Structures are given as structure tokens and as C-alpha cells.
């Protein structure tokens, strides 16, 4: 395996570990009485601000994009990233971390399959083996094979999260080589935050957002959710695809 390929595999594994921490932070926030809509808004908005500040301070030129590419960035953020975060949060709350992990880890498999169908990438025996082993491993470690009771809504949210993330990857597949991972992340977080704000306001959930911002424990957990499970995970996975 080439050095670049090894680095990409390691980054995907680290991204998976970051995604796996979702349940820890979500369970803490749930104990504070925070719902998925509220924590998703704080998560996406805070990460948009942080990535924006980072780019403005380090590489301001990276904030410039071709306006024609908004046709890719808007749905990637508003649909792919926002709905992914929202659906995955609800899935964890309804079916628990183990089962939600099985469902969400379908997304690399879906990305691979969609890439073969829509982007005409080669489906090799190695990819097929990785696909089978990843799905089998998720099922074994989650306890699904041991008779876990599944909530239909939680399963639907988990599958929806996997599909949304697949959509995000397909939409950006032709743009990842053009922009840096941080540029992609900033605009995805930005449009995800806008979509989340509209959704949260329409649902009448903004008072809950104010509660998070004024409660140190809830705010710390929400920032951890954003930094580890959104920023770090997304950057690692996006960088791996670029590699």
C-alpha cells in the first residue's frame, strides 16, 4: 500500500472514532433536557464560526470560492450535513449508540457504492471485502445479532443520516480537489447552520438554544460534540477523500 493510501486509511479510521463519540456527547446533552434540533443548531453554528475565524486568520484566500459552486455547497451543507447531524442525533436518542452506529456506518459503504454507480469508480475485490467486513463488524459490536429491540423511527433516522452523508459526498466529489478541506468544511457548516436556524425557529425551539448557551455544562458538551464529532471527523474524512 502506498504511503498516501496508508495515510488516507488512518484518517478514515480516526474519523470513525470521532463519529463514534457522538453518543457520549448526545447522551450528556439529553440529560440536560436538550433535544436534537437545539443541539444541532449550536453544533453547526459554532463550527461555522470557528472554521471561519481559522480561515480568515490563517489563509484568507481560502474563503474565496467560485459563486457557481454554491449549487454544490448549499445542498451539501443544508441537506447533507445539517440533516445528517439532525437524523443521527435523533437515531441515537431513540435506539441508542450501538444500533445507531450500525446504521451510520453504512455511509462509507453507501459512498463507495454510489461512487461506483455515479462516478464510475472501479469496484475491486478489496473494496468488496472491506464492505462486507465493515458491515459485519458493525453488526457484531453493536449487539444487533444478540436480539436488540429496534425502534422503527430510530432506524429510519439512522438510515436517513447515512443517506444524507452519502449525498454530501456525492455532491462534493468533483469539488474536493478544487478546494481545501477547511474551505469545504466552512461553507458546509455555514449553510448547515443557516438551515438549522430556519428549522429551529420554525419549530419554536430557540429558547432551548438560549438555555444551552447559558448553561456551562451543556455548552461544553455541545462544543465537544461540534469539535470532535463534526469538525475533526469531517476534516479527517474529507482530507482522506482528497488524498
Language-model features, listed with the residues they occupy:
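Glycine-/small-residue-enriched transmembrane alpha-helix faces in small-molecule transporters
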Residues: 1-42, 147-174, 194-198
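Juxtamembrane C-cap of transmembrane helices in multi-pass membrane transport proteins
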Residues: 18-34, 39, 46, 85-95, ...
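Specific transmembrane alpha-helical segments of multi-pass solute transporters/efflux pumps
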Residues: 23, 52-98, 104, 140, ...
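Membrane-interface helix termini and inter-helical loops of multi-pass transporters
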Residues: 24-36, 62-63, 93, 141-153, ...
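Transmembrane alpha-helices of multi-pass small-molecule transport proteins
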Residues: 31-83, 110-111, 164-171, 185-206, ...
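Specific alpha-helical transmembrane segments that line the substrate/conduction pathway
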Residues: 38-49, 79, 85-122, 161
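Hydrophobic transmembrane alpha-helices of multi-pass small-molecule transport proteins
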Residues: 51, 74, 114, 123-144, ...
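Loop-to-transmembrane alpha-helix entry segments
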Residues: 67-68, 104, 117-140, 148-155, ...
Amino acid at each position: 500500500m502506498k504511503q498516501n493510501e496508508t495515510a488516507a486509511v488512518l484518517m478514515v479510521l480516526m474519523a470513525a472514532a470521532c463519529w463514534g463519540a457522538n453518543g457520549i456527547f448526545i447522551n450528556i446533552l439529553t440529560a440536560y433536557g436538550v433535544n436534537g434540533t437545539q443541539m444541532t443548531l449550536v453544533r453547526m453554528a459554532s463550527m461555522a464560526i470557528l472554521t471561519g475565524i481559522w480561515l480568515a486568520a490563517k489563509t484568507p484566500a481560502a474563503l474565496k470560492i467560485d459563486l457557481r459552486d454554491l449549487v454544490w455547497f448549499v445542498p451539501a451543507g443544508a441537506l447533507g450535513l445539517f440533516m445528517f447531524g439532525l437524523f443521527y442525533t435523533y437515531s441515537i436518542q431513540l435506539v441508542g449508540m450501538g444500533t445507531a452506529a450500525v446504521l451510520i456506518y453504512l455511509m462509507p459503504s453507501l459512498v463507495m457504492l454510489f461512487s461506483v454507480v455515479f462516478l464510475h469508480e472501479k469496484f475491486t475485490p478489496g473494496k468488496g471485502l472491506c464492505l462486507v467486513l465493515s458491515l459485519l463488524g458493525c453488526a457484531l459490536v453493536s449487539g444487533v445479532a444478540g436480539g436488540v429491540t429496534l425502534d422503527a423511527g430510530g432506524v429510519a433516522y439512522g438510515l436517513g443520516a447515512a443517506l444524507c452523508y452519502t449525498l454530501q459526498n456525492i455532491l462534493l466529489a468533483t469539488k474536493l480537489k478544487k478546494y481545501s478541506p477547511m474551505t469545504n468544511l466552512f461553507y458546509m457548516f455555514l449553510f448547515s447552520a443557516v438551515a438549522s436556524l430556519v428549522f429551529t425557529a420554525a419549530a419554536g425551539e430557540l429558547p432551548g438554544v438560549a438555555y444551552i448557551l447559558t448553561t456551562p455544562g451543556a455548552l461544553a458538551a455541545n462544543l465537544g460534540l461540534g469539535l470532535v464529532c463534526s469538525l475533526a471527523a469531517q476534516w479527517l474524512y474529507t482530507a482522506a477523500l482528497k488524498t
